[in-house]
Curated annotation (Swiss-Prot):
GO terms for cellular component: DNA-directed RNA polymerase complex. DNA-dependent RNA polymerase catalyzes the transcription of DNA into RNA using the four ribonucleoside triphosphates as substrates. Pfam families: RNA_pol_Rpb2_1, RNA_pol_Rpb2_2, RNA_pol_Rpb2_3, RNA_pol_Rpb2_45, RNA_pol_Rpb2_6, RNA_pol_Rpb2_7. The gene is rpoB. It catalyses: RNA(n) + a ribonucleoside 5'-triphosphate = RNA(n+1) + diphosphate. The keyword Nucleotidyltransferase applies. The lineage of its organism: Bacteria, Pseudomonadati, Myxococcota, Polyangia, Polyangiales. GO terms for molecular function: DNA binding; DNA-directed RNA polymerase activity; ribonucleoside binding. This is DNA-directed RNA polymerase subunit beta. GO terms for biological process: DNA-templated transcription.
């Protein structure tokens, strides 16, 4: 029976109090789902949605020629299987991509006399459209052999935005409001107020014009516009020549009355007072309909329409004209009984649009369209037809203007929220409508009138994510549009369109070129950070505000970078780079996902009538507005009701204290607001934000170590991250482990399709992008039962399927001889000796033999002027052997390059004369190990151009690879056969033979009626099993047919692989042969290496002390690391102290359990102790009761390093938990102990904080940084040595160093620094010659940089000449002048 205690699963005590409601969504889903949606690879062509590639093809096709006689129509596309698999692409430096084939129809039309078109001919053909990179299982792309990630972009969402200039434009500080309609692609439309309150419009940020020009161009008259933007009041002429106006109750609030308003004798509103709500209510009750007016009240009002004399038909007052006393007199004379005026009171309603109409000189629709044309195409003589076309194309043509669904959604949200659903514009309407433009102006005027508020562009409802799929879609569209132009020209130019096929018209080069360029060099397509699994996952979850169409570092202000209230649960407030990109590059939060519109959503639990339900809904930042949201850590009772009478809740970004009934939603988890990297930091809630940021970022730089150990104090997120990162091997189906070795695991599957076993090949010592070592090792044993999703093998930096970036080490916080000054770290020699922090790094070196002008370079062992000692590790082909230990300067690949005839020096001539013509025409250009690198050669690969003969080494490598592939093939087929025959055996056993079975030689193997049992079946050769006559013979036959089919496809697959091996490689032009050599470098921990904890506590190793000199505990155990206690208070990362206490307790509890096993205590006693340790963790209740004695021992063995704790972020262990763990382990609850000095044996004065801390070794290794220059390159202009290790540069002597030399009065040393050691070219040569002669005097000349300065001055037209005179002559000349 299989054990309850799994070898591939770690039990972690959960110290959190909040129950898990939903699982964290797949961490790299943002990449995978986006690209899947783009390709729709698994969807049949006729069922594809109009998104991604399908949408691009649909939007560009059909392509019509200029005459309308033919068109090219898109039918469907399909992606073929990729030529090389992922591993082959990595090794060969290829792109992992699939050929895309598009089915097109070329339709040719005939035009009849009446203008009617009829189809004359349709030609359909599948056309090759280039290659499209595919995404790997882990969400990356392989481009030219390297893994790259396309980072998602966070950009401003299309839609309409309202803003003001914050009073900066005008000196008075007046707020000038503006509106901007941003489409996904197309022209931008801006409306803005000027300081005189006139509304202007700009199209594509050109010169501004009156907004009414655009509105008139839409076909609206002055009257239409006034009636749209203003309410009207009707004025009546009453008997006696008095005026009255109709009461519009909606407009009364806030107005003043000019006379007492009475109902009967009661005065409701006194003269010169405002209408109150109560007064309006009384007026409504009394059903007052008119208010009498004084004539002077009408003076200055504006007519809402042309007021016409009914008798003469003459217009007395034009629309938008002010009423004057004279006009009123004329109206009275003409006896016009009623007319409408605009309601403009200057308080609630301003006269902005009316004023704009007055100042606008353009009055008709046609003139307006021509005016717009003139502004956009200055210099072009406009005709009405071209102007109309241009205007229509600007905003109303779907080919030129696209709001996208998101833009339409945002417009509907802004303008039509109160309109019934069926009356709103549909999401498929992605062009502007005249109504949208009117609404934009109306909203702008409302803002100016003091109603509503401007938009916050940093609100996540106004920013959206463009993931890989969408970015690729845009690139593909650019390529297709380029191709479309060429196709149109070809279709129109070609006379024989009848004889052409679609492939004659289509040249897909521009499309593939765009795609290739995007993946190779776009700002968002990045070289994957592959230091460890966490850095990979974080890179894929990154959101960047930079990139094409985004912000730039220099222009981005503080607001864009800042944390916004809507980031909660969507974007991590902690994880962002330090430096110029701070805030511009962010990370998705743990539970966040991106919806179909590109807005980031976060999950919430629904709360109904003060009771929290299990329903989870995902909301975007816009949908969350106006909701009261409780925290995940609020106390609930059994029924899900709030225990407290008042609850803290978020409301529109503010925290409020509300009653439980008001709460509508609740967070799903405490770690909902932080990203994955921040969620891995235990006790994050006790760390200062700046240090938490460093802690989250530095985990990404941790190097995978030779021995991985998961943290004793984790957060429970480790297992999820390791699983989703793709570095572990995960079981695809349930089954039983059949065989395990270091390179592959075979699982006999159960359930559907169980005949085919699952074979998992493990990755072995692969070089990552950052030269760290990626390797996998099995964690399951033969015979073990595995479930779907179980971990079968650990990858780099994982331990039992959990992320393990560092090591648990015993740390003491105390000063030690000044060796922990400025965050330095004192380390015990045991750490170096036991390889605790040892890592393996794999460097790749490349040697290329080219065809040069002087002849071909050759890779060979025969190198001129090199002794046999230097060639001892090279084989006959001149390539280093695998397993050789190499040091700096050793030859890895011998190569000779032909050189031109050069003038020989006398020495060379002499040597030639003595030794004859020894390799005079070639020089040694071998690949040597660079300085600072040394290790063991673990692999060498030879790539030869197709058609060239391979050398011995290449043939050896090919033979080995072929043998490996054949071995794998044979093993796979054997496993397949065994599995199928096992199935047949199960079918046959116990059955009765219905006939006799005879072999080829006539021997009877089975008699009729015999019962088939195990021994008799074992004696029959397998090839006869299918012929055994039984009732189920047909099923057996079917199984055998399936087996043969499977075997055939597998053999074909491997045959293809072998064929590709022998073909030769595709190399860049001019390259004959390329050799790659891989060297594994073992890096032990040493002085100068950088280490860090998870709380931003970083430091450099200052000294490695012998174990016996380290401070030790009372039981004699020396500590591993000594850290500076002064690094904690000022940095406020107290989380590390809590971690160290809990870690110590966890470690000692593990030791206690081991001692109990050693003392052979009863398993019941051990179980009780385990229950006490895991008390409070609901998941572990009842687990220990089911364990037998063997299981107990096995379980205790899994905690030999300590009891693993999980302290989730923001829901972590409390002080009582930590004290409880220390107490249970028999340790002082203060977390401090007496330490003894290892050198003297004396106790230190005070108790010291000691415990287990999880420390990481970071990628900043001293071996990669240490560097010394001997003879190196000089800068071309200044003639000074270059800087930096990569350039083999020198150490810069800056002005501060010069001051120091001056302060010491070391004049000659300083002169030497500034001249011969730097850029005095002549002086350098003289110095060399002098030293050779044994003369050690310094003769400095003129530094080259002085000449540069003179040249710069001359470039400024200042002539500077150096005049050489002797000092004496100069002095006397000066005296004479005096």
């Amino acid at each position: 029976m299989p054990s309850v205690v799994q070898s591939n699963f770690r039990v972690r005590k959960n110290l959190g109090r909040v129950r898990r409601i939903i699982d964290v969504p797949n961490l790299i889903d943002i990449q995978k789902s986006s690209y899947d949606k783009f390709l729709q690879m698994s969807v049949p062509p006729n069922e594809r949605e109009e998104v991604g590639l399908q949408a691009v093809f649909r939007s560009v096709f059909p392509i019509k020629d200029f005459n309308g006689t033919s068109e090219l129509v898109f039918v469907s596309y399909n992606l073929e299987p990729p030529k090389y698999d992922v591993d082959e692409c990595r090794q060969r430096g290829m792109t992992y991509s699939a050929p895309i084939k598009v089915t097109n129809q070329l339709m040719i039309y005939d035009t009849r006399d009446g203008g009617e078109r009829i189809v004359r001919d349709i030609k359909e053909q599948e056309v090759y459209f280039g290659e499209l990179p595919l995404m790997t299982e882990t969400g990356t792309f392989i481009i030219n052999g390297t893994e790259r990630v396309v980072v998602s972009q966070l950009h401003r969402s299309p839609g309409v935005f309202f803003d003001h200039d914050k009073g900066k434009t005008h000196s008075s500080g007046k707020l000038l409001y503006s509106a901007r309609v941003i489409p996904y692609r197309g022209s931008w439309l801006d409306f803005e107020f000027d300081p005189k309150d006139i509304i202007y419009v700009r199209i594509d940020r050109r010169r501004k014009m009156h907004a009414t020009v655009l509105l008139r161009a839409l076909g609206y008259s002055t009257q239409d516009l006034l009636n749209y933007f203003y309410s009207t009041e009707t004025v009546y002429l009453e008997k006696g020549g008095k005026y009255a106006k109709s009461i519009e109750y909606d407009l009364l609030a806030g107005q003043r009355t000019t006379r007492d308003i009475k109902i009967g004798n009661d005065v409701i509103v006194k003269k010169n007072t405002k209408f109150t709500r109560a007064a309006i209510r009384k007026m409504k009750e009394a059903k007052l309909e008119r208010l009498s007016l004084e004539p002077e009240e009408l003076v200055g009002k504006v007519a809402a329409h042309d007021i016409v004399d009914p008798e003469t038909g003459e217009v007395v007052v034009e629309v938008n004209e002010e009423l004057t006393e004279a006009k009123l007199e004329r109206l009275r004379d003409a006896n016009i009984e009623q007319f409408r005026i605009l309601f403009i009171d200057g308080l609630n309603v301003g006269s902005y649009l009316r004023d704009t109409l007055l100042t606008d000189k353009v009055k008709t629709m046609e003139d307006s369209i021509l005016e717009i044309y003139r502004r956009l195409r200055p210099g072009d003589p406009p005709t009405l037809e071209t102007a109309k076309t241009l205007f229509h194309n600007l905003f109303f043509n779907a080919e030129r203007y696209d709001l996208s669904k998101v833009g339409r959604l945002k417009l509907n949200y802004k303008f039509y929220r109160d309109v019934p659903e069926d009356e709103r514009p549909g999401l498929d309407l992605t062009v502007l409508t005249p109504q949208d433009i009117l609404e934009t102006v109306r909203h702008l005027i409302e803002l100016k009138n003091g109603r509503g508020s401007v938009d916050d562009i940093d609100h996540l409802g106004n920013r959206r994510v463009r993931a890989v799929g969408e970015l690729m879609e845009n690139q593909y569209r650019i390529g297709l549009v380029r191709m479309e132009r060429a196709i149109k020209e070809r279709m129109s130019m070609s006379q024989e369109i009848d004889t052409l096929m679609p492939h004659d018209l289509i040249n897909a080069k521009p499309v593939s070129a765009v795609v290739k360029e995007y993946f190779g060099s776009s700002q968002l397509s990045q070289f994957m950070d592959q230091t460890n699994p966490l850095s990979e996952v974080t890179h894929k979850r990154r959101l960047s505000a930079l990139g094409p169409g985004g912000l730039t570092r220099e222009r981005a202000g503080f607001e864009v970078r800042d944390v916004h209230a809507t980031h909660y649960g969507r974007i991590c407030p902690i994880e962002t780079p330090e430096g110029p990109n701070i805030g511009l590059i962010a990370s998705l939060s743990t539970f966040a996902r991106v919806n179909e519109f590109g807005f980031v959503e976060t999950p919430y639990r629904k709360v109904e009538n003060g009771r929290v339900t299990e329903d989870v809904i995902w909301l975007s930042a816009l949908e969350e507005e106006g909701k009261y949201i409780a925290q995940a850590t609020v106390n609930l009772d059994e029924g899900g009701r709030f225990k407290e009478s008042l609850v803290s809740a978020r409301y529109n970004g503010e925290f409020k204290i509300v009653t439980p009934e008001m709460v509508e939603l609740m967070d799903v988890a405490p770690n909902q607001m932080v990203s994955v990297a921040a969620a891995l930091v235990p006790f994050l809630e006790h760390d200062d934000a700046n240090r938490a940021l460093m802690g989250a970022n530095m985990q990404r730089q941790a190097v995978p170590l030779v021995q991985s150990h998961a943290p004793l104090v984790g957060t429970g997120m480790e297992e999820r991250l390791a699983r989703d990162s793709g570095v572990c091997v995960i079981a695809r189906r349930p089954g039983v482990v059949e065989s395990v070795d270091a390179t592959r695991i075979v699982v006999r599957a159960e359930g559907e399709g169980a005949e085919v076993p699952d074979i998992y090949h493990l990755m072995k010592f692969q070089r990552s992008n950052q030269s760290t070592c990626y390797t996998q090792k099995p964690v399951v044993r033969t015979g073990e039962v595995v479930k779907k999703g179980d971990v079968l093998a650990d990858g780099p930096s994982t331990d039992m399927g959990e992320l393990a970036l560092g090591q648990n080490v015993l740390v003491a916080f105390m000063p030690w001889q000044g060796y922990n000054f400025e965050d330095s770290i004192l380390v015990s020699e045991r750490i170096a000796k036991d390889d605790v922090f040892t890592s393996i790094h794999i460097e790749e070196f490349e040697c290329v033999a080219r065809d040069t002008k002087l002849g071909k370079e050759e890779i060979t062992r025969d190198i001129p002027n090199v002794g046999e000692e230097a060639l001892k590790d090279l084989d006959d082909s001149g390539i280093v052997r695998i397993g050789a230990e190499v040091r700096p300067g050793d030859i890895l690949v011998g190569k000779i390059t032909p050189k031109g005839e050069t003038q020989l020096s006398p020495e060379e001539k002499l040597l030639r004369a003595i030794f004859g013509e020894k390799a005079g025409d070639v020089r040694d250009s071998s690949l040597k190990v660079p300085p600072g690198v040394g290790g063991i050669v673990i692999n060498a690969r030879v790539f030869s151009r197709k058609g060239t003969e391979k050398d011995d080494r290449a043939r050896d490598i090919e033979d080995q690879e072929r043998a490996r592939i054949e071995r794998t093939r044979d093993e796979e087929i054997k496993i397949l056969r065994d599995s199928f025959f096992r199935r047949i055996r199960e079918l046959l056993l116990g059955k009765e033979a219905t006939g006799k079975l005879v072999d080829d030689k006539g021997k009877v193997l089975f008699q009729k009626g015999a019962i088939i049992d195990e021994p008799s079946l074992a004696e029959i050769p397998r090839k006869y099993w299918g012929e055994i006559p039984v009732d189920d013979a047909e099923r057996v036959q079917q199984i055998l047919r399936d087996l043969e089919e499977l075997v055939r496809t597998r053999e074909e697959h491997f045959r293809d692989k072998i064929d590709r091996l022998s073909k030769g490689d595709e190399l860049p032009p001019g390259v004959i042969k390329m050799v790659k050599v891989y060297i594994a470098i073992k890096r032990k921990l040493q002085v100068g290496d950088k280490m860090a904890g998870r709380h931003g506590n970083k430091g450099v190793i200052s000294r490695i002390l012998p174990e016996e000199d380290m401070p030790y505990l009372q039981d004699g155990r020396p500590v591993d690391l000594v850290l500076n206690p002064l690094g904690v208070p000022s940095r406020m990362n107290v989380g590390q102290i809590l971690e160290i206490h809990l870690g110590w307790g966890a470690f000692e509890l593990g030791n206690q359990l081991q001692r109990m096993i050693e003392q052979q205590r009863a398993s019941a006693e051990i179980k009780e102790h385990l229950k006490a340790i895991y008390a409070g963790d609901e998941t572990m209740n009842g687990f220990f009761d089911n364990l037998d004695d063997g299981d107990v021992k096995r379980f205790v063995k899994t905690v030999d390093e300590g009891v693993f704790m999980g302290s989730p972020v923001f829901d972590g262990a409390h002080e009582s938990d930590i004290k409880g763990a220390l107490d249970l382990a028999g340790l002082p609850t203060s977390g401090q102990a007496i330490l003894f000095d290892g050198r003297t044996g004396d106790a230190f004065d005070q108790n010291v904080t000691v415990g287990i801390m999880y420390m990481l070794k970071l990628h900043h290794l001293v071996d990669d940084k240490i560097h010394a220059r001997s003879i190196g390159p000089y800068s071309l202009v200044t003639q000074q040595p270059l800087g930096g290790k990569a350039q083999f540069g020198g150490q810069r002597l800056g002005e501060m160093e010069v001051w120091a030399m001056e302060a010491y009065g070391a004049a000659y040393a300083l002169q030497e620094f500034l001249t011969v050691k730097s850029d005095d070219v002549m002086g350098r040569t003289r110095m060399y010659e002098a030293i050779v002669k044994g003369d050690y005097t310094l003769e400095a000349g003129l530094p080259e940089s002085f000449n540069v300065l003179i040249k710069e001055l001359q470039s400024l037209c200042l002539n500077v000449e150096l005049v050489e005179t002797s000092a004496g002559v100069e002095a006397s000349a000066a005296e004479e002048e005096e």
